[in-house]
């Protein structure tokens, strides 16, 4: 039988680990298109993702736990992206940055992957072409909140509709 003291220690330890993961995200940007300019703007001093624990990008996926997929992914890049994802440290999170990464954008053709969630699990989607820096920071804060709670918000295996995505990232009124 588990005592209340043991449960308290486990719960407190889980909360501490969640807090540490929330504020120490090691990011790896996989930048392929024009959203890369907006990603650089978010990383620079005016918006500064370092204030939110997602500091300087790492030079190898083995050192990172947050993958930013920024821009269009074509079928030739798909194996490289999947390999980068496999090399990342666990637990890992993925953000689809912009309309092209989330759904293929306006590149509806034979060469473009229609959303990176067809290849790897995606935890958060940032809409826009390109997305505003405020939207990127809002997404990062919401992902950190979910990391602190110990859950991944959206996984690729789930049946997620466009309405679910809109509801997920709609502004909170309460």
Please give the residue ranges for each predicted region.
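N-terminal, charge-rich interaction modules
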Residues: 1-63
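Residue-identity detector for threonine
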Residues: 7-12, 32, 49, 60, ...
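Aromatic-enriched hydrophobic runs in primary sequence
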Residues: 9-16, 85, 110, 146, ...
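Generic secondary-structure transition motif, activating predominantly at the C-termini of alpha-helices
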Residues: 17-24, 89, 144, 148
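Cofactor-cradling patches in redox/metallo enzymes
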Residues: 39-47, 51-119, 126-135
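C-terminal functional extensions of proteins
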Residues: 116-174
